[in-house]
Amino acid sequence: MISVIIPTFNEEENIAQCLVSLSHQSLPRSEYEIIVVDGGSKDATCEIAQKYADLVFTQTSKKVGGARNDGVMAAKGEIIATTDADCILPPHWLKKIAEDFLDPSVVQVYGPVYPIEEGIGNQFSLFLANMFSRIGYYSKTFFYTLGCNTAFRKNAFIRAGMYRCIDAGDDLEIAMRMKDTGAILFDNGLKVGFSMRRYEKFGAVQSIYEWIAIVSDGGESGKYSYSRKDYK
């Protein structure tokens, strides 16, 4: 079984389209579960999620990494897939993940993203992000495993120490520990629709700058707005 984990916080405007896309996967519904881990939403996020998800509960650990960790510990599946509440998953997303893990040496897979919103600027921003992912993977210097489009073996993830509860870079950091447990695979066909709302609100350059600054400082945000929960 594959367990899909989605952290949420005040996502009533986005969570339905994400969960609908997950409900229309080519993988049989009996072969995966949907887990929504909420960060204390004040809107109708949980009510909407309960219409589609197998399990909805409030996180007890801190930050997005902690929410994913909580989801992993509640998961029934031996394979864990993670995405974000504002993403759209193509119909064959879970089937691709299942196929990638037929190789017993693989402990984690990840793939590229494409913008949900239109615009040349959005396309260019994610072109650069995907290029960054490929450079890291093929050079074997780092693995830019975005939390919106990655999957891993539960046992290997737990052995690696799980996500750090930091503001940014937890998905990049965990991969450096996961590689010590087995092979990490970048699958060009494992694509996810990614919302550009953060970039459109704060600006692409500012968002990227803040992400780099936070990661360089060990993952703690402090003065930066990049990882705050109160943006819509």
Task: Cite the ranges covered by each PLM segment.
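Short aromatic/hydrophobic "clamp" motif used to bind/position activated sugar donors
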Residues: 80
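Cell-envelope/extracellular polymer assembly enzymes that use nucleotide-activated donors
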Residues: 1-3, 33, 173
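Acidic donor-binding loop at a coil-to-helix junction in glycosyltransferase catalytic cores
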Residues: 167-174
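Conserved donor NDP-sugar-binding/catalytic core segment of glycosyltransferases
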Residues: 92-121
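A recurrent flexible, glycine/aromatic-enriched loop bordering the glycosyltransferase active site
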Residues: 115-122, 133-152
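Short, well-formed alpha-helical segments that are part of the catalytic scaffolds
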Residues: 11-25
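A conserved acidic beta->alpha catalytic loop
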Residues: 21, 38-46, 87
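Glycine-rich, basic loop-to-helix element that forms the pyrophosphate-binding segment
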Residues: 59-75
